[in-house]
A protein has these predicted regions:
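Active-site neighborhoods and metal-handling regions in enzymes and metal-associated proteins
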Residues: 1-227
Length: 227
């Protein structure tokens, strides 16, 4: 069921991206996501189902009427942080997009964020400590010139809740990974000039390796291109 939830979330993100074109309000993107989730038999979390933002304000990932009213312009960076559920099991995925054209600045930032995330994921296995994995990512971000004070690095499990911890202290002190866990590493950098750069996936940890629940590519989404 977690895999099914992730699959319908992938489709909903693609439909949201296709609606994020210049001259349209962010509300069109949000509505496309919500309608897609419901049409596929899932539900979206909260009032809107996705945390989102565009342009410099996107670093805050706003979720309110003011943000929804923003009219997108070509070159706006868009955050997709999309959460929902299917038959009680949750999905949580984050991607970064840009409206209709690429950006050298976004590409540079995103390259560092993706490298940091994937380096930490490469060491994800039973017996690993999440704080050690977080340190791996933090070192790459720092080496790439990104300010850690503007960056969220957070491991969490996902299942019957979208953010699960076995013990409250796991949130701040980390935990030892066990086989069968489905985990997300949320990496979200906030750039004052262009906005948010966000990437996150759900991963099933097994003794044989990692199983990624999403099949959505990790490249920056150039929106409005039939993604």
């Amino acid at each position: 069921l977690l895999a099914k939830a992730a699959a319908i979330n992938d489709i909903a993100v693609r439909e949201a991206a296709a609606a994020a074109t210049s001259g349209r309000p962010l509300s069109d993107m949000v509505n496309a996501y919500r309608m897609s989730m419901v049409r596929q038999g899932g539900t979206f979390l909260g009032q809107r189902g996705m945390m989102f933002g565009a342009g410099p304000d996107g670093g805050f990932v706003l979720d309110n009427n003011y943000a929804e009213a923003k009219i997108l312009a070509k070159g706006d960076v868009v955050v997709f942080d999309c959460c929902g559920k299917y038959e009680l099991y949750h999905c949580d995925l984050a991607r970064t997009g840009i409206v209709e054209k690429s950006s050298a600045r976004l590409t540079a930032l995103y390259t560092v964020v993706r490298e940091a995330l994937e380096a930490a994921e490469a060491k994800l296995k039973p017996g690993a400590n999440t704080e050690d994995l977080k340190t791996i990512a933090a070192e790459i971000l720092t080496h790439g010139g990104l300010d850690l004070k503007l960056t969220t690095l957070a491991w969490h499990n996902v299942g019957l809740d979208v953010v699960e911890y076995a013990h409250p202290s796991d949130r701040t002190k980390g935990w030892v990974v066990e086989p069968g866990m489905v985990m997300n590493f949320e990496l979200f950098h906030r750039d004052p000039d262009i906005g948010g750069v966000h990437l996150e996936d759900s991963i099933h940890v097994t003794t044989r390796g990692l199983e990624y629940l999403s099949t959505l590519p990790r490249d920056v989404i150039v929106t409005g291109k039939g993604n």
